[in-house]
């Protein structure tokens, strides 16, 4: 089957990356009619197969293998994949683990333990890319807070930039939640990894566990959400973002278009993701949702994947990715009604700011999952200055610990220089300033320039 040369290689790093990866590949297989081993199901064989090639390579015997690499510095999570339902989907070479973990320590992931694994990982990634006709880029899944997710990811991004200079690198990052913390040193790891990858990543979609946890509890009525509930919801967002590479649509968006439309300045590349409708299976029949309904839902704080307040910031760009039973006329009407609403503010140098994608493939859900099957859904990616609030929160936590030099010896003991902490923190202070700068009105800036 000829490829149209829009392949993407997914790289899943650490526990968060691997477990989100599981949820994504489970969903992709269902969307494309593949069984657990990657073969087309009988009823799918006569249908026209849409561009599976972007995410799967096909072997001689008709097996579809994900273009993906899983990496963790210790084996537990990856062993679960090897022995799990989709264990046969991947070639053993695609799943790579070390012997000891990064112990929540950026320096272990980036310097000591990570160094031992990086060449093997790059070699396997190279093999994946040699199998592509026209590689579009890489999707990197990881968390900011873990040692592997932060340290190894930034090491890998550095090496990918050297080896595949011009290829897009998009990140899906789990940002530390405001209230729920998985480790004390999350603020250190997050700020160190953000500093290292800030100049290397083209676009970084952030999700935070607390926001998704609340979505599962409040909208899906799951009393005690587990990581698998959270990850299935994240997978729907990832699927919406990548659907245009995998299916036909009226207005398709490829990887480079995301950057062009969402990233006004290279450093300001952290769009906020919102997905609608998030409704549970038992409520779906009572709520037929129009294009206008789901579009308005995207602008509600409760549907966001990161805790921040968009009404306190300004939008620089908005990308609306619809899928299912949606026609452009309805979308235009919905956008007009959104623009008329108060409390949705755009920066004055980018007054229009809406990019739309429509994909005819209806949203598909996992059997026995929490989400209802619906006829249409939308994923909104918005670059808003409000996300600066998330950085400010993190910087504050960093400052509290660093003022006492708490836990710093663990990092320095793994070969890091203490100077790196301040260098990273200064870079994030500059990032906060960048956000403040773009949200100021052009008129104010012109007045200041006149004074000089």
From Swiss-Prot:
Residues the record lists as binding GTP: 15, 74, 143, 147-148, 182, 209, 231
Q: Name one GO biological process term.
A: microtubule cytoskeleton organization
PROSITE patterns named among the record's database cross-references: TUBULIN
**Which subcellular locations apply to this protein?**
Cytoplasm, Cytoskeleton
Q: Which Pfam families match?
A: Tubulin, Tubulin_C
Question: Do you know which SUPFAM superfamilies this protein is assigned to?
Answer: Tubulin C-terminal domain-like, Tubulin nucleotide-binding domain-like
Broad class of where this protein is predominantly found? cytoplasm
Can you list the GO cellular component terms from the UniProt entry?
cytoplasm; microtubule
Q: Which cofactor does it need?
A: Mg(2+)
EC?
A: 3.6.5.-
Active site residues according to the UniProt entry: 257
- Which reaction does this chain catalyze? GTP + H2O = GDP + phosphate + H(+)
Q: Signal sequence span per UniProt? A: none
The molecular function terms of the Gene Ontology recorded here are: GTP binding; hydrolase activity; metal ion binding; structural constituent of cytoskeleton
Domain of life where this protein originates: Eukaryota
Family annotation (PANTHER family): TUBULIN
What do we know about how this protein assembles, alone or with others? Dimer of alpha and beta chains. A typical microtubule is a hollow water-filled tube with an outer diameter of 25 nm and an inner diameter of 15 nM. Alpha-beta heterodimers associate head-to-tail to form protofilaments running lengthwise along the microtubule wall with the beta-tubulin subunit facing the microtubule plus end conferring a structural polarity. Microtubules usually have 13 protofilaments but different protofilament numbers can be found in some organisms and specialized cells.
- Write out the similarity annotation: Belongs to the tubulin family.
Give the function comment from the record. Tubulin is the major constituent of microtubules, a cylinder consisting of laterally associated linear protofilaments composed of alpha- and beta-tubulin heterodimers. Microtubules grow by the addition of GTP-tubulin dimers to the microtubule end, where a stabilizing cap forms. Below the cap, tubulin dimers are in GDP-bound state, owing to GTPase activity of alpha-tubulin.
This chain's protein is named Tubulin alpha-8 chain
